[in-house]
Amino acid sequence: MAVSTGGADWRDGATAEQVAAVEHLYRNHRSLPYISPERDLAAWLEEVGVSSSKAVPKWALEPVADIELYGGYLLEVTAGDIILLWRISFDTFTTQSWFPKYFEYTYGIDAAFDLRMLVEAGLVEIESAADSLDLVTAPALCKALKDAGVNGLSGTKKADLMRLAREHLSPAQLEDTVPVRSYMLTTAGRALLDAHPGMVAKHPKKG
């Protein structure tokens, strides 16, 4: 997938020799993988010199699906995007979740940027504040409800606090109460993930 670094580019802090080394390393790949401007290029190039397995494999940059976005922009979905969909499928990925380094170093994608594109493509959606109440602690829910004039909450279970929050808090109050949101797959996102079981099977699993 095409990537954006918000104006920053890894080449800005690299020497001419390092740029040439990276371009030579990936000369037979479809495109250059994403490289964070914060990466220690000298150390990484030294690791690659010892073991080529430290480089992004050629297959990881090959598109597995093309999706047209608004304005005719073509979104090229690669293996890293499938793994990102897989991570989201566990329903534990939130707007505060961190992205493992393998997205950059193994799959060659800027995961944060790609996630925004997957949302724009309708493959992933950000849950509403009301649907993300499970991410809020019980004490925080109690405070929000008390601030809204709801009393008698002592000993109330979290599930009931969530229900009361949906019933008594205005949309604006919910927005303030739920700073973190969950990501979830849409039907299209689930279908795309299910169409590529081999990608998930190839991904290293802990344990």
Task: Describe the function of each predicted region.
Residues V3-G6, W10-G207:
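Basic helix-extension-helix modules of the SAP/HeH family
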